[in-house]
């Protein structure tokens, strides 16, 4: 196995990016990552894009080839692969590229995670996200990702004695990290007490425990 390094990055701001299409965001971040790495398109052996929802929210499948085309990589004749694993799609795309490079199959990969979740209504995006659950036994029964994670949290509390204060500290920690990132959707810190006092969504998860809908691309 060979060592693998991340040599360049490009990222959009996290949030409601209504003024730009998925392909425009892909072009912006793809070129930024390539320039940051100091490479050219001739150096790239493969493209991996993690995406869950474009087929539902944008009626656009085959997004890896779309982004390759708009980034000027189509003439390089490299494999462009879409990776889907619900909310972990971007992370799994990194894993696939890592395995290909570490195994010696390729030398350089462009890897990205891309979603446009705010171009549709909240109900439509919630329905799309619920497709990542079991359609027959969970989604059809009305389960959402939030309610399923609430059940997981309840079981964790029962098994390990996890407290409300500990759950709030997780959200507060995440918001603190966001306060250090100018590209974050909500770049400000939160006190754990504010998390505990926010509105209930699905017991025991409150509003500030839950991830908001957003659009972004990072490569």
Task: Cite the ranges covered by each PLM segment.
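Generic N-terminal amphipathic, Lys/Arg-enriched alpha-helix
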Residues: 3-18
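Beta-strand segments within the central parallel beta-sheet cores of soluble alpha/beta enzyme folds
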Residues: 41-51, 78-85, 109-113, 165-172
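Phosphate/pyrophosphate-binding loops at sites that engage ATP/ADP/AMP, CoA/4′-phosphopantetheine
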Residues: 31-45, 156-161
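Conserved catalytic cysteine-centered active-site region
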Residues: 2-5, 54-109, 116-148, 186-212
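Short, well-ordered amphipathic alpha-helical segments that serve as non-catalytic structural scaffolds
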Residues: 23-38, 63, 67, 93, ...
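N-terminal leader/propeptide and maturation segments of large enzyme subunits in energy/redox metabolism
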Residues: 143-195
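Conserved small/polar residues in nucleotide/adenosyl-binding loops
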Residues: 217-219
């Amino acid at each position: 196995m060979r060592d693998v390094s991340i040599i360049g990055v490009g990222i959009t701001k996290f949030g409601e990016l209504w003024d730009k299409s998925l392909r425009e965001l892909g072009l912006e971040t793809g070129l930024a990552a390539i320039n940051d790495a100091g490479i050219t398109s001739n150096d790239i052996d493969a493209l991996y894009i993690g995406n869950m929802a474009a087929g539902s929210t944008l009626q656009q499948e085959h997004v890896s080839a779309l982004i390759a085309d708009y980034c000027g990589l189509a003439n390089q004749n490299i494999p462009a692969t879409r990776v889907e694993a619900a909310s972990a799609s971007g992370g799994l795309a990194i894993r696939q590229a890592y395995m290909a490079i570490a195994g010696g199959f390729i030398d350089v990969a462009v890897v990205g995670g891309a979603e446009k979740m705010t171009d549709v209504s909240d109900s439509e995006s919630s329905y799309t996200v619920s497709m990542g659950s079991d359609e027959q036994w969970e989604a059809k029964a009305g389960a959402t990702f939030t309610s399923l994670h609430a059940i997981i949290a309840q079981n964790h509390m029962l098994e390990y004695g996890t407290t409300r204060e500990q759950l709030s500290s997780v959200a507060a920690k995440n918001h603190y990290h966001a306060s250090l990132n100018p590209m974050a959707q909500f770049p400000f810190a939160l006190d754990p007490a504010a998390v505990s006092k926010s509105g209930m969504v699905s017991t025991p998860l409150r509003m500030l425990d839950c991830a908001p809908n957003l659009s972004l691309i990072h490569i």
